[in-house]
Amino acid sequence: MADNLEPLEPSLQNLVEQDSLKWIFVGGKGGVGKTTCSSSLAVQLSKVRESVLIISTDPAHNISDAFDQKFTKVPTKVNGFDNLFAMEIDPNAGLNELPEEYFDGENEALRVSKGVMQEMINALPGIDEAMSYAEVMKLVKGMNFSVVVFDTAPTGHTLRLIAFPQVVEKGLGKLLRLKMKVAPLLSQFVSMLGMADVNADTLSQKLDDMLRVITQVNEQFKNPDQTTFVCVCIAEFFSLYETERLVQELTKCGIDVHNIIVNQLLFLQNSHDSCSMCASRFKIQEKYLDQIADLYEDFHVTKLPLLEKEVRGPESIRSFSENLMKPYNPKGEPKE
């Protein structure tokens, strides 16, 4: 690109101020501080949005540790906030991870549909995780949060999360065809148990409803006005390599990505006062920061500091989140 182009604002202010955004994914290599960054972003969004939900799709469920509060698969208000909620799901658990209330109903059909759907899904390798995402999306859309932030698992899981609408759309067709085969058996089985209200049409309707939601989500995921992805990395070779792979895959999937967070940076004010290891690490980070500047000159690149203490608890996250909105200043910002 031309040298006279102005660098983009080195913060996430552009995302926080984009009122149209509905889905924001935060991801990257393991151990780079995704959860701290996603939690901090959610805190900043809660200042300008009516209601914010942060969802952890990482089986490690670090947002409970980050906010120092236990979260479950049901949205729970974060302590110290009026409009920030959090929930944790394990996509590997499939439909068993969903709240039981989702399958409650006035007749036996809805109460047994969870088990039947799980058995049908198990017949299609690879779709279980995608269906879990699909059901979560259906639940979340019904809750009408202003914006949803995803604290994703390491890169491989993240790419599957992004691709799940296409997987589900293909898989639902197979499920509906499978339904036609098992419908007679299902009807005989439930008749023996005296559950006259249960029929294959109930399951079919549930799958059709889900397909409509997923088609809509798929369209929203590829709309940069509604969905974007924030890549988190550290200034090291493997993390930068993983970030570039992630950016390329997201671009291939049609997902907007124009923000990168470089976390855990050393800000040496006086190299003479630093230890030899710190000075060495600083030089390594400077080398990769130069590469990031060359690779992502059309991205907003936010630089975050390595702190002496861990960022944990709502007040600590609230304080750290300010670094997302304006460039970190080691002289003006006291260390936590």
From Swiss-Prot:
Q: Which PANTHER family match?
A: ARSENICAL PUMP-DRIVING ATPASE ARSENITE-TRANSLOCATING ATPASE, ATPASE GET3
What Gene Ontology terms for biological process does this UniProt record contain?
tail-anchored membrane protein insertion into ER membrane
Identify the CDD domains for this entry: ArsA
Name where it's found: Cytoplasm; Endoplasmic reticulum
Major place of residence: cytoplasm
- Check the record and name the Pfam families matching this protein: ArsA_ATPase
Q: What is its EC number?
A: 3.6.-.-
- The top EC class is hydrolase
Query: Transmembrane region positions?
Result: none
Give Gene Ontology CC terms. Answer: GET complex
The GO molecular function terms of this record are: ATP binding; ATP hydrolysis activity; metal ion binding
Kindly list the positions annotated as binding ATP.
Answer: K29, G30, G31, V32, G33, K34, T35, T36, E236, N263
Catalytic center at which residues? Answer: D58
Q: Which UniProt keywords apply?
A: ATP-binding, Cytoplasm, Endoplasmic reticulum, Hydrolase, Metal-binding, Nucleotide-binding, Transport, Zinc
Q: Could you describe the subunit structure of this protein?
A: Homodimer.
Q: What is this protein called?
A: ATPase ASNA1 homolog
Q: Where does Zn(2+) bind?
A: C275, C278
The keyword DNA-binding is annotated on this UniProt entry: no
State the protein's purpose: ATPase required for the post-translational delivery of tail-anchored (TA) proteins to the endoplasmic reticulum. Recognizes and selectively binds the transmembrane domain of TA proteins in the cytosol. This complex then targets to the endoplasmic reticulum by membrane-bound receptors, where the tail-anchored protein is released for insertion. This process is regulated by ATP binding and hydrolysis. ATP binding drives the homodimer towards the closed dimer state, facilitating recognition of newly synthesized TA membrane proteins. ATP hydrolysis is required for insertion.
Q: Which InterPro entries match?
A: Anion-transp_ATPase-like_dom (IPR025723), ATPase_ArsA/GET3 (IPR016300), ATPase_ArsA/GET3_euk (IPR027542), P-loop_NTPase (IPR027417)
